[in-house]
Regions:
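Non-heme Fe(II)/2-oxoglutarate
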Residues: 31-32, 37-40, 45-48, 52, ...
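Short, P/G- and charge-enriched loop/turn segments at secondary-structure junctions
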Residues: 120-125, 177-179
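Conserved hydrophobic/aromatic beta-strand scaffold that supports enzyme active sites
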Residues: 15-17, 114, 134-138, 179-181, ...
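Short, structured patches in soluble enzyme cores that scaffold and shape functional sites
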Residues: 102, 117-119, 137-141, 153
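Non-heme Fe(II)-dependent double-stranded beta-helix
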Residues: 1-12, 19-115, 121-124, 233
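Double-stranded beta-helix
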Residues: 142-199, 221, 238
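Short, conserved beta-strand element in jelly-roll/cupin
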Residues: 125-144, 191, 215-219
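Residues that flank catalytic or metal-binding motifs in active/ligand-binding sites
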Residues: 70, 99, 131-133, 145-147, ...
Length: 259
């Protein structure tokens, strides 16, 4: 499925973009299904939701996790043909398993994410690396103007960088990196190594930058199951409850910020 050029890009830079992975009709369905999910009520025991307060004092959804088990059409469209998993298996050189999924909505006037690595095992105080590849499914076009991602190429090979308790890479270290913007179109997928440093700015445009992330482990490594991970997640980073204080919303994680 993948070309040698794509495999080399993954090894060298820590990411690879697969253009037009979803046909236009499938992409439209995915976009509509994601909009369905954005309208769900808060759940105490199923999906996990976080919100943010805009500059004009509105509450907008920021992020949701653990939703695919509760939206059959979206799950089937993304996973049933195994194309995404096959691409991940190819890049990792072995079988993989899906740990989690999340949606970051990045609507206009939403916040950004400071430089970080997707180092899941460290905040959860687990001994072994538990994530090895993250697949970003482009729901909308993405570029720097609407809060698109920036990556530091090749730094996925250098292990874990110094970071604070929230997972933000030490600013003095991050300032030494060269950062490249990553642009994609709706329907593309973008697969990156979880050790690849990246960040995104607040969305100051009038365009959404919705992205659905599928997080994969190597099957040969240990780590929690999906159910075990969701228990860990609720304990470490509690989602919003059914009664929310607009001025005291629960943060989606330690790397999120608003200007």
């Amino acid at each position: 499925m993948l070309t040698d050029t794509q495999r080399d890009k993954w090894q060298k830079d820590g990411y690879v973009r697969l253009e037009s992975f979803f046909a236009p009709a499938a992409q439209e369905d995915i976009s509509n299904f994601v909009e369905d999910v954005s309208c769900w009520d808060v759940s105490d025991d199923k999906w996990l939701m976080w919100f943010e307060k805009t500059t004009d004092n509105r509450k907008i959804i920021s992020k949701i996790e653990n939703f695919l088990d509760f939206h059959d059409p979206l799950r089937r469209l993304l996973l049933e043909d195994q194309r995404i998993k096959s691409a991940v298996d190819d890049l990792l050189g072995e079988d993989s398993r899906r740990l989690k999924e999340l949606l970051i909505f990045h609507y206009p006037d939403s916040g950004g994410y400071l430089p970080h690595q997707d180092i899941y095992h460290i905040p959860h105080k687990l001994p072994d690396r538990m994530v090895h590849a993250v697949v970003a499914v482009g729901i909308d076009d993405s570029d720097p103007e609407n809060g698109g991602l920036f990556f530091s190429l090749g730094n996925h090979k250098k292990g874990v960088f110094p970071m604070d308790a929230g997972g933000v890479i030490d600013p003095q270290v991050a300032e030494t990196f060269s950062w490249e913007p990553v642009v994609w179109k709706a329907g593309d997928i973008f697969i990156f190594d979880d050790y690849a440093p990246h960040y995104s700015r607040p969305n100051k445009s009038n365009r959404s930058r919705r992205t659905l992330y599928l997080v994969f482990q190597r099957a040969s490594t240990g780590g929690p199951t999906r159910a075990e991970y969701n228990v860990l997640k609720r304990a470490l980073n509690p989602p919003e409850g059914k009664v929310a204080d607009l001025d005291n919303l629960k943060p989606p994680n330690g790397i999120f910020y608003r200007d």
